[in-house]
Amino acid sequence: LWPQYTKGWPQDCRTPRRPFVPDAVISGMLDIMPSRGLVIHEYRKHGTCSGLDVQGYFQLSRQLFTSIRIPADFVNPFETQYFEPRDVKRAFVAANPGLRPEHIAVACGRGNRARLSEIRICFSKDGKPIACGQNEAERKLCSASEIAVPPVRSTRREEGVQATPRPSPLPGPR
């Protein structure tokens, strides 16, 4: 959840007290965020600029995350799949009738068959989907003609352990 301007975003805002994320809040977010470090980082860098306290910031993050239905192709794939960035947007629009393509930004690595890194959904302050700003321009975030969506689970049975699935890239409101 990143507060932002039309061009750019505020970050690491000064607060009366040093930003602290309680263990209970961190633990409560690990089902949708892949690590403790990321939970802490997101609040310190972006949450401090949101005007919300730590509980309010993560409550809103969860509310917006759960408001988005992740299309089946992006939930726990067991093999690498390839999509054009516009098809990623189409899938999210089809799964979420209130979304339009301009509300979604696809981010990927470099190269023609780059790996999907994030799917960003842009929201207004009141939680309504809005067109993403210039800092979410696709030519900056993902210029690949095709992107790879890798598997999120270990498929090697000989290990005897199945990896805990990571959530699909957080369609973090931006």
Predicted regions and their residues:
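C-terminal, well-folded lobe of enzymatic/effector domains
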Residues: 22-174
